[in-house]
Regions:
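Gram-negative host-targeted secretion-system effectors, predominantly Type III and Type IV
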Residues: 1-148
Length: 149
């Protein structure tokens, strides 16, 4: 799934690995961006939830700002840490397990999304719909390219 996404910069190592590699500042910048992304998700939900329904396309503004990879990573992190919570749909929890989020000395708890789980579940579904649309468009473009060859 990640291979077809635009090349969005994400630092792949834990803080300990970054320290060992002499790249701690790069890790810190990535970590701060993960935290900001989690905050942007909370703000988008606050903006687009009317008390009963989450506005369609709520995830798009956050995706436009932070990219598919980072938004997916931050969402997966929250669902993985809340795997016990029955308010998340099983398909969303299963999706979250397809994304590797390393244990990082407790740092991953810092970019945990604090929105209500039932509403966040709707945001995750909206994100996944956006991702599926991207995949469909990418597949269609590849098919069109094959037809012109």
């Amino acid at each position: 799934m990640w291979s077809m996404l635009p090349n969005e910069a994400m630092y792949p190592y834990t803080a300990k690995e970054a320290r060992d590699r002499g790249e701690l500042e790069v890790w810190r910048a990535n970590f701060r961006t993960n935290c900001a992304c989690a905050g942007a998700i909370e703000l988008a939900i606050h903006r687009d939830f009317d008390g009963m329904h989450l506005k369609d396309g709520c995830a798009k503004s956050v995706i436009d700002q932070y990219g598919y990879r980072r938004v997916g990573y931050v969402l997966a992190n929250t669902l993985q840490l809340h795997a016990y919570d029955g308010r998340y749909h099983e398909t969303n929890k299963r999706w979250s397990r397809t994304i590797f989020v390393p244990e990082d000395g407790g740092h991953r708890y810092t970019f945990l999304i604090g929105s209500h789980p039932a509403v966040l579940d709707g945001f995750v579904s909206d994100y996944r719909a956006e991702l599926e649309q991207l995949q469909a468009n990418s597949n269609q473009a590849m098919s069109m390219g094959e037809m012109t060859m």
